[in-house]
Curated annotation (Swiss-Prot):
This protein's name: Small ribosomal subunit protein uS5c
Subunit structure: Part of the 30S ribosomal subunit. Contacts protein S4.
Gene Ontology terms for molecular function: rRNA binding; structural constituent of ribosome
Domain of life of the organism encoding this protein: Eukaryota
GO cellular component, one term: chloroplast
GO biological process: translation
Function: With S4 and S12 plays an important role in translational accuracy.
Keyword Transmembrane helix in record: no
Comment block on domains: The N-terminal domain interacts with the head of the 30S subunit; the C-terminal domain interacts with the body and contacts protein S4. The interaction surface between S4 and S5 is involved in control of translational fidelity.
UniProt subcellular location: Plastid, Chloroplast
Gene3D superfamilies tied to this protein: 3.30.160.20, 3.30.230.10
Amino acid sequence: MQNMNEQQEQWQERVIQIRRVAKVVKGGKKLSFRVLVVVGNLNGCVGVGMGKAADVMSAVTKAVVDAKKQLINITLTPTNSIVHASQGRFSAAVVFLKPAASGSGVIAGGAVRSVMELAGIQNVLSKQLGGSNPLNNAKAALLALKSSSANAR
């Protein structure tokens, strides 16, 4: 039981977006909630997940489970930055990441900032181009981190 609690505490989660969606059925509209969540351990492991349910709490739980299924490992430098510049593209969203000097902080906005902070990255520059959808930007940031780590090996 102690080990289970330690594993639970090691992951941090952050809700990026809660959206009420509707399915039109014969009797009217069936409302549900779609939640976008980022999960990370602040030590080079991060994932993005989405969940949909009739109430917000169930949707958040489903999103966390989905995010933990899609975790990626990132190679961090001693200054808690990425190894080298990279680019990720998902749908219309394009995210550029560039390593920054120690003390620069996370210079990113929206969903990309959440992904960087929960991955444990403390010094990075980013630029978002194309779409402004938080889901697409978060997934583009993950792809950029993945390509940065893949090229480092």
